[in-house]
């Protein structure tokens, strides 16, 4: 009896462990805020189109940090293990002087893609003032990169200070928020969106923005960037 009890208990513990692991790798319940970053590890993330150890990203004082490096030494963009369709995503971020990074969503992995931006729209994060190259409005902080520019409500904090951002994607309706203000709003896949895609930067990327479900990506652009309090709610 005791032997059977121990065997049953051991089996149950294994099942519980497996269930816990599966729950961490599945889409969370609708309407519930879930942490994408636990403040102490890279659990739940992997390198885009990669397996194994994530390079060039680290944890500093509870923040997820892209360490920044020369172009040929990038650790690469990182993506969530879980794919999302309709969601509200919020996070805090800051960059160093001349820094550049971004958050992408509905990212698709596969041999045909070399980078998340080939499929995933991007919330741009950049040093609008001191970036070494001239920036167009569609390249500046808060923009739906190369598609929709931020409005005049945009107020970005100085380099080195934390900002709060949010993306809402709900059945094609998209909003970008920055420090409490809605700065971008558009409808994905409508005639206006299709025209902008076909005539702009993404005309040579046929799969850009078309996925209705995909991974969340944090960009390694060779500059130091800091993220914390990354949360998502499925809608």
Predicted feature locations:
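Bacterial Sec-dependent N-terminal signal peptides
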Residues: 1-28
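Carbohydrate-interacting regions of secretory-pathway proteins
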Residues: 21-235
């Amino acid at each position: 009896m005791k032997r059977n009890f121990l065997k049953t208990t051991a089996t149950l513990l294994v099942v519980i462990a497996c269930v816990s692991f599966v729950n961490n790798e599945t889409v969370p319940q609708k309407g519930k805020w879930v942490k994408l970053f636990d403040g102490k590890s890279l659990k739940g993330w992997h390198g885009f189109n990669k397996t194994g150890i994530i390079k060039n990203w680290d944890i500093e004082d509870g923040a997820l940090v892209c360490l920044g490096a020369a172009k040929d030494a990038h650790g690469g963009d990182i993506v969530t293990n879980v794919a999302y369709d309709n969601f509200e995503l919020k996070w805090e971020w800051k960059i160093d002087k001349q820094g550049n990074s971004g958050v992408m969503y509905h990212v698709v992995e596969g041999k045909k893609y070399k980078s998340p931006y080939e499929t995933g729209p991007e919330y741009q994060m950049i040093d609008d003032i001191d970036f070494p190259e001239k920036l167009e409005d569609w390249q500046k902080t808060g923009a739906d990169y190369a598609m929709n520019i931020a409005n005049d409500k945009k107020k970005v904090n100085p380099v080195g200070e934390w900002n709060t951002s949010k993306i809402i994607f709900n059945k094609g309706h998209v909003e970008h928020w920055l420090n409490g203000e809605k700065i971008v709003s558009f409808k994905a896949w409508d005639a206006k969106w299709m025209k902008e895609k076909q005539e702009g930067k993404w005309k040579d990327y046929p799969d850009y923005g078309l996925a209705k479900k995909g991974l969340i990506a944090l960009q390694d652009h060779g500059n130091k960037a800091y993220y914390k309090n990354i949360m998502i709610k499925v809608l």
